[in-house]
Amino acid sequence: MPTSKYRIDTHLFFTNGEMIKLKYEDLLEESKASNVYVIENADFKSSADGLINGNVIGINRKIQSFCKRTCTLAEELGHYYTTVGNITGQSTVSDHKQELRARIWAYNKLIGLNGIVNAYQHGCHSLHDTADYLEVTEEFLLEALQYYRGKYGKYVTLDNYAIYFEPSLGVLELV
């Protein structure tokens, strides 16, 4: 069972007193280092969670979940690094491919195979605990696992671990 934790501002504190920076703060720092300006409480006319225009990212102020804000910022940064032009209409195959590229960037940034193993090493044995540990929504984690399943098949090995995607997420330490 993971150590319990609580949040103050942009830092996470474990009950044992250890403090870690949240991924959201890391993404904000990465944005700044890449000269990307983030408007954290944007007032959108659309229902989008996040939008990017050039080097300006807006995060919809209606998003209350900290994990959802993290996932949204990661995906918008993925667009900054991997897409070209306006793809908001999703009207072409190229637009869909660029959207997927941005999502894959976000999956790998926030989760990745190492993140799955780290969650396991920290006692996470359910999707809820794993998502909580990785600071992502369960929906985002499930979408990432579906992508990884499509890319790697039923399982993949990483160092001395086997990560199973079917029938459900599982991590096995190899001897």
Model-derived features: positions:
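Active-site hotspot residues in diverse enzymes, especially metal/ion-binding acidic/histidine motifs
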Residues: 1-72, 77-175
